[in-house]
């Protein structure tokens, strides 16, 4: 996870001090890219322990088109609790846009199903793009999409993914985002009969909150450990049929977790 640690170090040393929506204050840089070879191990941060259950269940929740936190709460995942209303609803966030994007004519579009079909039909397409940034529905969202657009690319029978993330909470959010989109790439590859290539992570405003500086410095004192490996149930070939038990991470031996407050 050298690219991630380099980002952490760079922002601590050279980031610009900025105010932000939450009132916490940040140190940030604009425009940063990381690349992870998905054949060299699963890109899961080892310099602190991540909550795998949250990463996996959140992605499955997105893929089902769900926007209510009931499923997450039922599976002991609390990462969206602060933004949900009294009924557990978040408005038309990621799952809605991925699976039921509403066009100007009111017709809903299943972007993810289209993506799987198009990769099979035309793997050389330059239009293998999914967007969660539906301008007409942004005001209704509890939180506007941070990881807003991603694109797939096929060459030599391998599927790569590039994510554009407009806003990245480097200490808490970005490690989750790396793992989530790496997992998604593996799942889409299996559903389309492909191997995996790279995950490319492009960040717009990459920031550390001011109350995460000490935690980031502590993390940088730790020596990275070998990356784990991802194991998917080979019998699942429908992207939307994956369940939690179909996904396993082997050999994850991280340093202890480092607690940090969430900026809401």
Curated annotation (Swiss-Prot):
(6R)-5,10-methylene-5,6,7,8-tetrahydrofolate binds at residues 51, 169, 263. It catalyses: dUMP + (6R)-5,10-methylene-5,6,7,8-tetrahydrofolate = 7,8-dihydrofolate + dTMP. GO terms for biological process: dTMP biosynthetic process; dTTP biosynthetic process; methylation. InterPro entries: Thymidate_synth/dCMP_Mease, Thymidate_synth/dCMP_Mease_dom, Thymidate_synth/dCMP_Mease_sf, Thymidylate_synthase, Thymidylate_synthase_AS. It is found in: Cytoplasm. One of its GO terms (cellular component) is cytosol. Coiled coil: none annotated. The active site is at 146 (nucleophile). DUMP binds at residues 21, 126-127, 166-169, 177, 207-209. Its EC number is 2.1.1.45. Its main location: cytoplasm. The keyword Transferase applies. GO terms for molecular function: thymidylate synthase activity. Keywords: Cytoplasm, Methyltransferase, Nucleotide biosynthesis, Transferase. SUPFAM superfamilies: Thymidylate synthase/dCMP hydroxymethylase. Pathway: Pyrimidine metabolism; dTTP biosynthesis. Belongs to the thymidylate synthase family. Bacterial-type ThyA subfamily. HAMAP family: Thymidy_synth_bact (MF_00008). Catalyzes the reductive methylation of 2'-deoxyuridine-5'-monophosphate (dUMP) to 2'-deoxythymidine-5'-monophosphate (dTMP) while utilizing 5,10-methylenetetrahydrofolate (mTHF) as the methyl donor and reductant in the reaction, yielding dihydrofolate (DHF) as a by-product. This enzymatic reaction provides an intracellular de novo source of dTMP, an essential precursor for DNA biosynthesis. Homodimer. This is Thymidylate synthase. It comes from Xanthomonas campestris pv. campestris (strain ATCC 33913 / DSM 3586 / NCPPB 528 / LMG 568 / P 25). The gene is thyA.
């Amino acid at each position: 996870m050298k690219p991630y640690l380099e980002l952490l170090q760079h922002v601590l040393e050279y980031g610009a001090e900025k105010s932000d929506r939450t009132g916490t204050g940040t140190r940030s840089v604009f425009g940063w890219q990381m690349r992870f070879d998905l054949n060299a191990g699963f890109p899961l941060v080892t310099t602190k322990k991540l909550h795998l259950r949250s990463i996996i269940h959140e992605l499955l929740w997105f893929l089902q088109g769900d926007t209510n936190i009931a499923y997450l709460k039922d599976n002991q995942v609390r990462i969206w609790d602060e933004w949900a209303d009294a009924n557990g609803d978040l408005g038309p966030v990621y799952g809605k846009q991925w699976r039921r994007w509403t066009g100007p004519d009111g017709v809903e579009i299943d972007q993810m199903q289209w993506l799987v079909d198009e990769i099979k039909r035309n793997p050389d397409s330059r239009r293998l793009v999914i967007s969660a940034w539906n301008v007409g529905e942004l005001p209704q969202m509890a939180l506007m999409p941070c990881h807003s657009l991603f694109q797939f690319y096929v060459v030599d029978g391998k599927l790569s993914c590039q994510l554009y993330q407009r806003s990245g909470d480097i200490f808490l959010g970005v490690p989750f985002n790396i793992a989530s989109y790496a997992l998604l790439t593996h799942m889409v590859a299996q559903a389309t009969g492909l191997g995996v290539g790279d995950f490319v992570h492009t960040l717009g405003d990459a920031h550390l909150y001011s109350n995460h500086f000490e935690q980031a410095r502590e993390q940088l004192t730790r020596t990275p450990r070998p990356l784990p490996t991802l194991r998917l149930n080979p019998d699942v070939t429908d992207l939307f049929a994956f369940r939690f038990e179909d996904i396993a991470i082997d050999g994850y031996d991280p340093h202890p977790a480092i607690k940090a407050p969430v900026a809401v």
